[in-house]
C-alpha cells in the first residue's frame, strides 16, 4: 500500500510486458507514464535552436526525464519519496546517468552486487523470469555488459574479493 510503481516507456518499449508482469506479481499500485512527450519536446527545442544532440545526450535524456517524472509523481503523492534502483556493481564502475537513474532519496540495493540482488529477489520469492533477464538500460538496445565491455561477474569478483579478471585488466 505504500509503494507505487511507475513504468516509463519512451514511446514504444518492447519489454513493457515484463514491467507490467512485475507490478502485477507484486500487486502494487502503478502508473504507466509515457515520457516520449518530454524527451521529444527537449530534442525538438534543441533542433529549433540549431543544436545537434550528441549520442550521450540522446542516451541519457530519457533517464533524466524519468527522474523528473518520478519526482513530480512523488511530490503529488502523500509523503511520496523517490528510491533509486542502483546497486553496488553499477555504482562501483560508475554505470549510471548522473541526475537520472542514480538519483533518489536513498538506494535500498546500494550495498548489494548484481548477484546479491538476484539472490535477494529469489529469497523474497520472485519468479525466475524476473531474476534472469539480462540487465539493460532499456535505452540503447544493448545489455549493460555490452555497454561496459566486461561482465558484472568480473566487477563483483573485484568488489567482494579483490580479484581482477586478467581479460578485463588488459
Set out the residue ranges of the language-model regions:
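ATP-dependent adenylation/nucleotidyltransferase module used to activate substrates
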Residues: 1-93, 121
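Short, flexible coil/linker elements and helix-boundary hinge sites characteristic
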Residues: 50, 121, 131, 161-162
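Short alpha-helical "packing" element that flanks the helix-turn-helix/winged-helix DNA-binding module
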Residues: 154-162
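Residue-level marker of positions within ordered structural domains that often coincide
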Residues: 75, 126, 163
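Catalytic subdomain that performs nucleotidyl-dependent activation
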Residues: 58, 62, 80, 84-154
Amino acid at each position: 500500500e505504500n509503494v507505487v510503481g511507475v513504468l516509463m516507456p519512451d514511446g514504444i518499449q518492447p519489454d513493457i510486458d515484463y514491467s507490467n508482469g512485475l507490478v502485477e506479481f507484486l500487486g502494487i499500485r502503478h502508473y504507466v507514464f509515457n515520457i516520449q512527450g518530454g524527451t521529444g519536446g527537449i530534442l525538438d527545442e534543441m533542433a529549433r535552436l540549431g543544436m545537434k544532440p550528441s549520442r550521450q545526450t540522446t542516451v541519457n535524456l530519457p533517464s533524466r526525464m524519468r527522474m523528473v517524472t518520478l519526482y513530480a509523481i512523488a511530490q503529488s503523492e502523500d509523503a511520496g519519496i523517490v528510491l533509486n534502483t542502483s546497486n553496488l556493481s553499477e555504482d562501483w564502475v560508475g554505470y549510471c546517468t548522473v541526475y537520472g537513474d542514480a538519483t533518489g532519496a536513498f538506494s535500498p540495493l546500494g550495498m548489494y552486487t548484481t548477484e546479491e540482488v538476484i539472490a535477494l529477489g529469489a529469497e523474497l520469492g520472485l519468479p525466475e523470469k524476473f531474476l534472469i533477464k539480462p540487465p539493460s538500460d532499456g535505452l540503447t538496445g544493448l545489455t549493460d555488459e555490452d555497454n561496459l565491455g566486461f561482465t558484472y561477474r568480473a566487477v563483483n569478483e573485484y568488489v567482494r574479493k579483490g580479484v581482477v579478471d586478467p581479460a578485463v585488466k588488459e
